């Protein structure tokens, strides 16, 4: 995906109330951005880092600017807008650049399914093949030279794992897909030190047939794309 129109830079002052961030542009203008990320954003919102933001022409929006990327002082790039993870995976599925998920004729997004009334991020189907349910998670937490998910306790994520396991038990393909939106991450693990129940559910779901995939992304102020598979360490 390309950022069009081009993103603009600013210096981060603070993130607060989860969905807001104060920044200062290179010409000294103070702005309040919408922060499209509900997580803890540990390591992604250090005051002084460079924020790259987009602008909306929707006059009804109270905060027309959105925080898209962080460029850290050490030169790492982080995708802050978690909505982009689904978009990136969808683009890669359509292009056939994820070999493990290639060969399906039909792709649908946000399809309702499961006993807990969830929505699957992507559903693949083809004649003669079992439907494939794909749940996408955005990974940005870097600690101890490894990436972790989640960065906070996630009841919603736990529900998604239960739903995926149920689909696998019914004979469908079920895939948990970690999209790594942090240039400094080269491997990923469930964050047992943050949400031990989520980590247990990942291990259990895998034992029942849920596939776990992890791909890194190329990130820049110009755009992003799914790039290369990364190791996933589950214990």
From Swiss-Prot:
InterPro entries: SfsA, SfsA_C, SfsA_N. Pfam families: SfsA, SfsA_N. This is Sugar fermentation stimulation protein homolog. It comes from the Bacteria. PANTHER family: SUGAR FERMENTATION STIMULATION PROTEIN A (PTHR30545:SF2). Belongs to the SfsA family. The gene is sfsA. GO terms for molecular function: DNA binding.
């Amino acid at each position: 995906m390309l950022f069009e129109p081009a993103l603009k830079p600013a210096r981060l002052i603070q993130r607060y109330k989860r969905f807001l961030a104060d920044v200062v542009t290179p010409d000294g203008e103070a702005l309040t951005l919408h922060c499209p990320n509900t997580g803890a954003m540990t390591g992604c919102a250090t005051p002084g880092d460079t924020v790259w933001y987009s602008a909306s022409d929707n006059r009804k929006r109270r905060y027309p600017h959105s925080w898209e990327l962080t460029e850290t002082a050490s030169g790492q790039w982080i995708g802050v807008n978690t909505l982009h993870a689904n978009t990136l995976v969808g683009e890669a599925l359509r292009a056939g650049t994820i070999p493990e998920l290639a060969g399906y004729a039909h792709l649908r997004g946000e399809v309702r399914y499961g006993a807990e009334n969830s929505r699957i991020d992507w559903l693949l189907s083809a004649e003669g093949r079992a439907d494939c349910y794909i749940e996408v998670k955005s990974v940005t937490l870097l600690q101890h030279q490894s990436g972790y998910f989640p960065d906070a306790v996630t009841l919603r994520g736990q529900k998604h794992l239960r739903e995926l396991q149920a689909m696998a038990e019914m004979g469908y393909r079920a895939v948990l897909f970690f999209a790594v939106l942090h240039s400094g991450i080269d491997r990923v693990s469930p964050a047992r030190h943050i949400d031990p129940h989520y980590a247990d559910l990942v291990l259990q779901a895998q034992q029942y047939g849920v596939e776990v995939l992890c791909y890194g992304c190329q990130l820049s102020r110009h755009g992003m794309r799914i790039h290369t598979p990364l190791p996933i360490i589950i214990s």
